[in-house]
Structure formats: structure tokens, C-alpha cells
């Protein structure tokens, strides 16, 4: 009597309830399991969603320490100096070059750009990776000006936006990648003066600071007209010095700002109502030693415990 085989969708559903460590062990069970876990981006999204619903997600900061060498830091650790909170990561594919840019991440999927515009998407938890085609810029040595990554749940599609500068013809070239179509679309980006490389994803849009003390936004749901729009900063916003855009509590744009008049202080603002300038609210001030006034900084807020953590990187 033949044993009844479980349908593929039932197996995938069961696997989504397993933690990542167990999933990695299951890749050795069979080629079928290995293919589902490591090669199916839809399974990765389902597993991520299940972990988020169960509130078992790990919140980790991914960073590059030396070219294509990566580490991740557990943001829930009591002390950032604890070596047990750091995990060394290894690329599951040969690194195309020693120069790499971390374009961004979304739902545990990381997007990388190597020299000569070689792009990859990578899931550090499962080892899944996929090479992305060249965006079609006129020259492969163009410098990346700004970039970011977002995910559209209704379309089940990851989008990557990159803008590079053609140093010969002095013009910007932009392109947006769709993981669903596995292709790029070009867009106009000549009028922009973005001052922050890495963007911020919120409300299905990407956001950057520009040189005019405004936030430039790009709606990822656009189908035909790929246009940028601008949002105003707080009316009380002082002279721009060091600033960065982030997300507070998963639903509000935030702004960390170091005014020149008070170089030993960081002001954190929150836009309570998206797109409404008058909804900007000053959340708190953070004072620190003046020697750190020229640091790059990122804000992390743990809303579950109501703790705010501000990290400065020299």
C-alpha cells in the first residue's frame, strides 16, 4: 500500500511555523524541502509574516565591516558591547568585488550593489539569494547617489530604486526594479538634490532629505508616471546641519536633527499625520558630548518597552 504524500501547499504551510534554525536543518532532509526553503521567495515572505503574527521576529541591525563581510547586531540586547549579540554572516555566493553598498532591506530580504552595478537580493536567515539584472545605466562606473528598498504586499513585489550620476555628461540616471517582473524601468531624476544616500520606507513610499530642507518622496505604487514629490519639514526646523529621516513606531516619519547652534544636542521630530506639515511634533532632545557632533547617527525606538535608543557611529 502506497503512502499518501502531503500536498505541496500543506508542507509549505507547516514549514512556515518553524523557526529559522529548524528550517536550515530541514534543508538537508530532501531536495524538495531545500528548494522550498532556499529558493522560493514566496515561502520566505509567508514565513516572515507568520513569525511577525506570532511576534517571534528577531530585530537585528545588518552592517558591513570590511567590504563584503557582514555582521548583524541583536537590537534587543541589554548591551551593544556584548559579543554574543553579534552574528557573523557569510555571503552564499562568490563576492563579485570588494566594494559593496547595502541598498536596504525589507522583511528580512537584503539588497546589495557591488562594483560595476552587480546587484543581488539575499535572505541572510535562510541563505536564499538571487542575482538582479543590470539596471541599464549608460556607464557601469556611475556613482550611486541615493537608493532604497520597499515592499508592496498587495502586489507581493519588492521594489528597489537607484539613482546614479553620469560624471561625463553630468546628469542623473534613475531606475526602479521589480522583483515580480525581475526587470528595471528607467525614470527621470535630473532635478533632485538629495543629500542622504540611504532612504526610508513608509506608507509604500521611499523618503530622502534634499538640500532644500525638504523631504523627497517616491510612491512605489506608481505604474506609469514615476514622479518624485516633496514634503515640508517642521516650521520650527532650524539651520540644517546633520539630519536623517527614519520611522517611529512603524507608522510615522521621524527626523533626527543636530542644529548648528547646539552641536551637542540632537532633536527628534515625529510627523504624527503623514504628509501634514503642521503635524510635526518635537519628541525629545538628547544631549551628548560635543566631540560626537560630527558623527553619523541613527535612531532606534523600542515601542514595546517605551525605551528610546540613539546610537552614534563615528
Predicted stretch roles:
Residues 1-314:
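N-terminal entry/capping and adjacent linker segments that precede and initiate structured domains
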Amino acid at each position: 500500500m502506497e503512502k499518501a504524500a502531503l500536498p505541496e501547499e500543506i508542507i509549505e504551510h507547516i514549514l512556515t511555523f518553524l523557526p529559522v534554525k529548524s528550517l536550515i536543518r530541514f534543508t538537508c532532509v530532501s531536495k524538495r524541502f531545500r528548494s522550498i526553503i532556499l529558493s522560493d521567495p514566496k515561502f520566505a515572505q509567508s514565513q516572515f509574516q507568520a513569525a511577525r503574527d506570532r511576534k517571534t521576529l528577531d530585530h537585528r541591525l545588518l552592517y558591513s565591516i570590511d567590504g563584503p563581510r557582514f555582521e548583524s547586531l541583536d537590537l534587543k540586547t541589554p548591551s551593544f558591547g556584548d559579543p554574543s549579540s553579534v552574528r557573523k554572516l557569510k555571503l552564499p555566493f562568490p563576492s563579485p568585488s570588494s566594494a559593496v553598498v547595502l541598498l536596504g532591506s525589507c522583511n528580512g530580504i537584503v539588497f546589495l550593489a557591488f562594483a560595476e552595478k552587480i546587484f543581488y537580493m539575499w535572505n541572510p536567515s535562510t541563505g536564499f539569494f538571487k542575482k538582479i539584472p543590470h539596471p541599464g545605466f549608460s556607464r557601469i562606473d556611475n556613482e550611486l547617489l541615493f537608493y532604497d528598498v520597499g515592499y508592496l504586499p498587495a502586489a507581493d513585489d519588492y521594489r528597489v530604486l537607484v539613482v546614479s550620476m553620469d560624471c561625463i555628461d553630468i546628469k542623473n540616471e534613475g531606475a526602479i526594479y521589480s522583483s515580480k517582473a525581475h526587470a528595471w524601468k528607467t525614470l527621470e531624476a535630473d532635478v533632485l538634490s538629495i543629500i542622504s544616500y540611504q532612504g526610508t520606507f513608509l506608507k509604500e513610499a521611499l523618503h530622502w532629505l534634499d538640500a532644500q530642507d525638504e523631504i523627497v518622496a517616491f510612491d512605489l505604487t506608481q505604474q506609469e508616471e514615476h514622479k518624485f514629490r516633496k514634503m515640508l519639514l517642521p516650521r520650527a526646523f532650524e539651520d540644517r546641519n546633520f539630519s536623517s529621516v527614519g520611522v517611529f513606531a512603524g507608522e510615522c516619519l521621524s527626523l533626527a536633527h543636530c542644529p548648528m547652534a547646539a552641536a551637542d544636542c540632537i532633536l527628534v521630530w515625529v510627523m504624527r499625520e503623514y504628509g501634514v506639515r503642521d503635524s510635526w511634533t518635537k519628541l525629545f532632545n538628547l544631549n551628548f558630548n560635543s566631540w560626537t557632533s560630527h558623527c553619523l547617527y541613527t535612531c532606534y525606538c523600542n515601542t514595546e518597552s517605551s525605551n528610546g535608543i540613539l546610537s552614534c557611529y563615528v
